[in-house]
């Protein structure tokens, strides 16, 4: 076991604080509309230029083990804020640095770290209550666009594209971001349900120009097992042929003889058919097949439910207006499903999202929900160079998360003013003792720092700007750093999602509280590796050979 280096109390806290400061100072220059860029060197390819706080935080690794502990804990703040709200990472980092600095000063002055933490937690709860009370719901796509514009550092096109996408697929819909080939921003909207399985054989193609299968008014057979021969399916296939309508088969897999028979029938023109594999794996596959069944008013043919293939009738098959299949995706448009049944299924998935503890499961459930409730929109981000495209894609991702957060919990005035005015909610709040009251004061001071930093990045004195606003006392008034004007920020469109501000503060206080109450730090000592012995010249063992 390797030897350990242990640091205690003041020595440990000072080294950790140094690491916190290094990371926070690199991240906070990106805050606000006039925040600066950070250039990140890459081991391969061109350097990356970004204004995204979490991207900067993730790249920082320090040589000193103890300083690195502080930096990594602060990186955790940025990552947590990013995971929960998708934005507010720089705000969270600035808040955490302010809380850690003041907290460590107080601990050095002899205050009880645990009481300081209790005071901090008390103040954070009060500020969160105040933010929720002042939050207003998002109304209309213009406010959604505005949230996107602010989060994308003033890029109007980004905000408008996100608002347009949300309008088309609904607030529950899936919106994905991809890199485009050209210079322009593009928005593609897929109606209906899409899943990532393509046709099993190119012989099913009906439109050779576009290399896709198009089925109009098809029946849809949803089968949860593999199909290796079609003997048991003959009755239903004959019924479909007589109806004159096409058939889509969705099954776990369609192998050998079964696939060959379908292809031959398709080529002879007797049966208009296409086959795809079922989406997902395991239990998730069953759930997704059930979703498709509800969407198309069909039944999932499952032997577990006592339904055999030979007993299937036409009214057990799903129906849709149109199905399009390319080599990678299948899209079912306008399924014949009952609106009430679909609504019930949506509620059921929502309940599962609430109770699940796994981020992966939650993401997959949200995808299923979106496919049932709305549709899928793809925003394609263009640019002149690869570096520009990547930087813009980062901003679009941030803006997308921010707009979702705004729809979820509403909005507050932006530019750091919501937290600045929350200091009023802390007036008169006292802890059980002086140390707890000091913890409350730490938060009162810390929640001014985002506004001060935004003003400083715009070339103003942060303390003067904060003082001016607190003197005016109108909670709608703020400092618009983009135009250097004091004005009503909501009216000017400078707004932040309440969820982003709330999670930034809660995550910052959580990690800062842990750092303040740290009394020892343990790290591995580097091993002294012995120097490699000097090799003798030539090839060993070849001496004495006379050529």
UniProtKB/Swiss-Prot annotation:
GO terms for biological process: protein refolding. GO terms for molecular function: ATP binding; ATP-dependent protein folding chaperone; isomerase activity; unfolded protein binding. It comes from the Bacteria. ATP binds at residues 30-33, 51, 87-91, 415, 480-482, 496. It is found in: Cytoplasm. It catalyses: ATP + H2O + a folded polypeptide = ADP + phosphate + an unfolded polypeptide. Keywords: ATP-binding, Chaperone, Cytoplasm, Isomerase, Nucleotide-binding. Its main location: cytoplasm. Its EC number is 5.6.1.7. GO terms for cellular component: cytoplasm. Residues 527-547 are annotated as: Disordered. Belongs to the chaperonin (HSP60) family. Together with its co-chaperonin GroES, plays an essential role in assisting protein folding. The GroEL-GroES system forms a nano-cage that allows encapsulation of the non-native substrate proteins and provides a physical environment optimized to promote and accelerate protein folding. Forms a cylinder of 14 subunits composed of two heptameric rings stacked back-to-back. Interacts with the co-chaperonin GroES. NCBIfam families: GroEL, PRK00013.1, PRK12849.1, PRK12850.1, PRK12851.1. This is Chaperonin GroEL 1. It comes from Sphingopyxis alaskensis (strain DSM 13593 / LMG 18877 / RB2256).
């Amino acid at each position: 076991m390797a030897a350990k280096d242990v640091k205690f109390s003041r020595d440990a806290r000072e080294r950790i604080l140094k690491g916190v400061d290094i990371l926070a100072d690199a991240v906070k220059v990106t805050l606000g509309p006039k925040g600066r860029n950070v250039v990140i060197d890459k081991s391969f390819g061109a350097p990356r230029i970004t204004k995204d706080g979490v991207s900067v935080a993730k790249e920082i690794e320090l040589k000193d083990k103890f300083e690195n502990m502080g930096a990594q804990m602060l990186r955790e703040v940025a990552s947590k804020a990013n995971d929960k709200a998708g934005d507010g990472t720089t705000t969270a980092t600035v808040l955490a640095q302010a809380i850690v600095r003041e907290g460590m000063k107080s601990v050095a002055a002899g205050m009880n770290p645990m009481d300081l933490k209790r005071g901090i937690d008390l103040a954070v709860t009060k500020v969160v209550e105040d933010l929720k009370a002042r939050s207003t719901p998002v109304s209309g796509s213009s406010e959604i666009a505005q949230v996107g514009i602010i989060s994308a550092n003033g890029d109007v096109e980004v905000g408008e594209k996100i608002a347009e996408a949300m309008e088309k697929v609904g607030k529950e819909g899936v919106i994905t971001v991809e890199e485009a080939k050209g210079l322009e921003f593009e928005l593609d909207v897929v109606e209906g349900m899409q899943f990532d399985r393509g046709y099993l054989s190119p012989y099913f193609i009906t439109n050779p120009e576009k290399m896709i299968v198009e089925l109009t008014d098809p029946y849809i057979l949803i089968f949860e097992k593999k199909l290796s021969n079609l003997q048991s399916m003959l009755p239903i296939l004959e019924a479909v042929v007589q109806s004159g309508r096409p058939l889509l088969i969705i099954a776990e897999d369609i192998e050998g003889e079964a696939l060959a028979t379908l292809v031959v029938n398709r080529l002879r023109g007797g049966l208009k058919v296409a086959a795809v594999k079922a989406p997902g794996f395991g239990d998730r596959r069953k759930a997704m097949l059930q979703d498709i069944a509800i969407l198309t008013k069909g039944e999932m043919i499952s032997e577990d439910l006592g339904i055999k293939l030979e007993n299937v009738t036409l009214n057990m098959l799903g129906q849709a207006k149109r199905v399009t299949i390319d080599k990678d995706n299948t899209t079912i448009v306008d399924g014949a499903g009952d609106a009430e049944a679909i609504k019930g299924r949506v509620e059921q998935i929502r309940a599962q999202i609430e109770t699940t503890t796994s981020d992966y499961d939650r993401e997959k459930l949200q995808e299923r929900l979106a496919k049932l409730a709305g549709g899928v929109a793809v925003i394609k981000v263009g640019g002149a160079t690869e570096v520009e495209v990547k930087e813009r894609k980062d901003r679009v991702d941030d803006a997308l998360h921010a707009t979702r957060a705004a729809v979820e919990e509403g909005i507050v005035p932006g530019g750091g003013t919501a937290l600045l005015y929350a200091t009023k909610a802390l007036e008169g709040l006292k802890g059980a003792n002086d140390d707890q009251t000091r913890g409350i004061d730490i938060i009162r001071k810390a929640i001014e720092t985002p506004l001060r930093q935004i003003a400083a990045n715009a070339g103003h004195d942060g303390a003067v700007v904060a003082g001016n606003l607190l003197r005016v006392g109108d909670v709608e008034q703020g400092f618009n750093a983009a135009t250097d004007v004091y004005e009503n920020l909501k009216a000017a469109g400078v707004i932040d999602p309440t969820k982003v501000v709330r999670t930034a503060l809660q995550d910052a206080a959580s990690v800062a509280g842990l750092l303040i109450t740290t009394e020892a730090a343990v790290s591995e000592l580097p091993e002294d590796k012995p120097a490699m012995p000097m090799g003798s010249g030539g090839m060993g063992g070849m001496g004495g050979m006379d050529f």
